Amino acid sequence: MVAEITNELNFKTAIQAKKEMDAFWKYAESVIGKKPYCWECGDFISKSDYRAATAHIFPKSIFESVASNKWNFLVLGARCGCHDKSHRLDTFSQMKVFPVAINRYMKFGELITEKHKYLSLFQDYANKITQ
């Protein structure tokens, strides 16, 4: 009985998370559609690449608490390679767009519930830039 209730709660949570992510992708697509250019290099982003150009600042697989937060992304082209550069903080922090990531993080950072070294490293890099 307890297992059935737990499974049903997990199922409802998963459905809610999917709805939130669907809304997130739709919002990101609307932002990109208004100005479909990579925020780092300025390359054009075709409509078929909008989702691939949506680069989470804090990876959605690790930071589920902010995976669907409307501030937790940058527009970085996949074809130009800028999205890939954001996967490692040592390269991400050297990008022109990193200060934008910091500003966006300031709008949702307190909502992060996970403890992970990525968060403290991001904050360290951000502190170096903002000092």
List the predicted regions and their residue ranges.
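Short cysteine-rich loop/turn motifs with clustered Cys
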Residues: 20-53, 77-79
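Short Cys/His-rich "knuckle" micro-motifs
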Residues: 48-57, 86-94
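Short, charged/polar surface micro-motifs in flexible loops or helix N-caps
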Residues: 46, 60, 82-83
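Short, charged surface segments at domain edges that flank catalytic/cofactor-binding sites
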Residues: 1-37, 64-67
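Short flanking/linker segments adjacent to small metal-binding domains or redox-active Cys/His motifs
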Residues: 100-131
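Aromatic- and Lys/Arg-enriched surface recognition patch
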Residues: 70, 90-95, 100-109
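Short Cys/His-centered divalent metal-binding micro-motifs
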Residues: 73-97
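Short linker/helix segments within small regulatory modules
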Residues: 58-72
